[in-house]
């Protein structure tokens, strides 16, 4: 496939944000009504994704049906994140609670004989933090009769930048249709303060954790590459020429996508047809 045009971030973000807002809020409203649940519960970190998810949920079903949980770990979460999260939940007028997960994390790692130290176990302990937050969200959802609202975006979904059964655990995922760069613009439009809408992204799974530093390229670059591949259907090998981005960066995104395919799939199991070949015939069947 010969690519005779240039793809830029302008192409990615050139969408009807008011139309997108209406479509997502209508989806959230109808889904909740069909489920019979009483509302939505979500984690709010003070970052752009959870801020937009909160704003859309309130827009869709009203502040009285939304519960926000702020779940810092005092060992790794900057105070500014907690302050930003509190500023948001108060401005949207939703029921909320601040739950420090650090004591829970400490109980886990003190009980695990395989644990060595925070530095050597940085990634598994970081993912443990995400899974603890998911457990708390589902506890609240179960107790309050609500659905867990996911906050991950399409960029993170396609490159697997999330914790399996952690921040990906949810009943509804309204933002997996939007790239990070689109999320930022919609967030600002819907009323999220600009300093939060454009705050550098971080899962805060360990001290000093910054998303773009870990990934090795910016979300703007990631979005242009993903948009080229999955929306414009440009082959991976043609994307450097179409975007002007380094081949190494395109290859990095391709590898992230392919290596994380298991995160976007249900658990693997043996083929049922093969197993049924070994079934015994029912008694009396002729």
UniProtKB/Swiss-Prot annotation:
This is NH(3)-dependent NAD(+) synthetase. Homodimer. ATP binds at residues 43-50, 151, 180, 202. Mg(2+) binds at residues 49, 156. Residues 277-286 have a biased composition (Basic residues). The keyword Nucleotide-binding applies. The gene is nadE. Pathway: Cofactor biosynthesis; NAD(+) biosynthesis; NAD(+) from deamido-NAD(+) (ammonia route): step 1/1. GO terms for cellular component: cytoplasm. SUPFAM superfamilies: Adenine nucleotide alpha hydrolases-like. The lineage of its organism: Archaea, Thermoproteota, Thermoprotei, Desulfurococcales, Desulfurococcaceae. Keywords: ATP-binding, Ligase, Magnesium, Metal-binding, NAD, Nucleotide-binding.
């Amino acid at each position: 496939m010969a690519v005779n045009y240039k793809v830029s971030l302008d192409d990615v973000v050139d969408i009807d944000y008011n139309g997108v807002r209406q479509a997502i809020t209508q989806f959230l409203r109808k889904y909740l009504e069909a489920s019979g649940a009483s509302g939505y519960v979500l984690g709010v970190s003070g970052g752009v994704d959870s801020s937009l998810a909160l704003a859309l949920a309130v827009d869709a079903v009203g502040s009285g049906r939304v519960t926000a949980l702020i779940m810092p770990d005092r060992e790794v979460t900057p105070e500014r994140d907690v302050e930003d999260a509190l500023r948001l939940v108060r401005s949207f007028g939703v029921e909320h609670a601040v739950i420090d997960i650090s004591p829970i994390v400490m109980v886990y790692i003190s009980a695990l004989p395989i644990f060595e130290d925070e530095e050597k176990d940085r990634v598994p302990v970081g993912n443990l933090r995400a899974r603890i937050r998911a457990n708390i969200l589902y506890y609240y959802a179960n107790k309050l009769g609500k659905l867990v609202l996911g906050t991950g975006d399409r960029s993170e979904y396609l490159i697997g930048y999330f914790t399996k059964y952690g921040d990906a655990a949810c009943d509804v995922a309204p933002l997996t249709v939007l790239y990070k760069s689109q999320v930022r613009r919609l967030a600002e439009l819907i009323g999220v303060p600009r300093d939060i809408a454009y705050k550098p992204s971080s899962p805060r799974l360990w001290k000093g954790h910054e998303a773009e530093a870990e990934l090795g390229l910016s979300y703007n670059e990631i979005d242009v590459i993903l948009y080229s591949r999955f929306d414009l259907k440009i082959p991976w090998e043609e994307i450097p020429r179409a975007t002007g981005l380094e081949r190494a960066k395109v290859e990095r995104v391709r590898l992230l996508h392919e290596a994380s395919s298991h995160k976007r799939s249900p658990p693997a199991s043996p083929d049922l047809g093969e197993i049924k070949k070994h079934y015994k015939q029912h008694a009396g069947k002729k």
